[in-house]
Structures are given as structure tokens and as C-alpha cells.
């Protein structure tokens, strides 16, 4: 299976999903089976609420598995990676960098914050998630301990 890394997705002015990676720039098509399979696996494992919603939306396509996977991946891309910018949507380590996509249904869509900017599946406790958030914000161990009223030792 293809590894997802250093990929930029964006929506063209014509409304097509475009891909920029080591192969160059091209339109995302159903024939991109390896990319679709890799993206689909990440969605299924790491974003189960988004996966469930996408499965419900494209339920009628399930009989044609490759097309079902493509439709789910295509929608996930459109809802999360719309801008062409200098920050890869999938970085060198395979981490997603979600973007705020210009969507006329923001706040009204029943899939808002489910498919777009989905919650990452983790077995971390709320306290552990808070530690990760503070670490991502650049806090040092001592500062995190201070904020959370904990001893470093």
C-alpha cells in the first residue's frame, strides 16, 4: 500500500480535486487506487466518526468497493484540504494538516466537525490530551506541570 506523505490537495477553480506530490500535479480520479486505499485506511482507523458519516452518505456505493472508497476519500479531501498553499496537507510523517475550507454550509451542515476537521481517534485520557495540546503549543515539561498543578517528578 502507498504511504501517504508530502501530499498537497486542493480544489481547482473548476471544482476538481487536485493532487500535488512527487508525481507532480494531477486531478484526483477514481484510478488513483493506491492513494485512495491509503487515505481510506487512515480515515477508517484514525477518524472513525468521519468514517461512519461517510459510510452513511455513500452507503449505496458499498457494493462497488473501489468506487465507495474513492467517494469517501474524495469527500474527505474536499472538506478538509481545499487550499493550495505551502504547507503539505499530509506531511513527511503522514500527519494531516487540516485547513478551514471555505464552505457555505459551515455551522449548518450536520457533518460540520464530523467530516470536516474531524476528531482524531485516540485512547488518551482527557488529561493526556491536555498535555499533548500544551506540548504542541510549545510548552516545556515544567510549564505543563505548573499549568496542570502537577510535579515534574
Model-flagged regions — what are they?
Residues 117-153:
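Helix-turn-helix DNA-binding segment
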Residues 1-114:
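DNA-contacting interfaces and partner/effector-binding or oligomerization modules
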Amino acid at each position: 500500500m502507498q504511504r501517504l506523505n508530502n501530499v498537497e490537495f486542493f480544489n481547482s477553480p473548476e471544482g476538481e480535486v487536485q493532487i500535488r506530490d512527487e508525481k507532480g500535479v494531477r486531478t484526483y480520479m477514481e484510478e488513483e487506487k493506491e492513494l485512495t486505499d491509503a487515505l481510506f485506511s487512515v480515515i477508517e482507523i484514525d477518524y472513525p466518526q468521519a468514517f461512519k458519516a461517510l459510510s452513511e452518505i455513500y452507503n449505496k456505493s458499498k457494493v462497488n468497493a473501489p468506487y465507495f472508497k474513492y467517494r469517501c476519500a474524495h469527500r474527505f479531501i474536499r472538506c478538509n484540504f481545499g487550499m493550495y498553499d505551502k504547507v503539505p496537507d499530509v506531511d513527511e510523517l503522514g500527519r494531516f494538516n487540516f485547513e478551514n475550507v471555505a464552505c457555505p454550509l459551515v455551522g449548518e451542515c450536520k457533518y460540520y466537525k464530523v467530516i470536516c476537521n474531524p476528531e482524531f481517534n485516540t485512547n488518551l485520557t482527557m488529561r493526556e490530551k491536555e498535555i499533548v495540546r500544551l506540548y504542541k503549543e510549545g510548552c516545556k515539561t515544567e510549564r505543563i506541570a505548573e499549568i496542570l498543578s502537577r510535579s515534574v517528578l
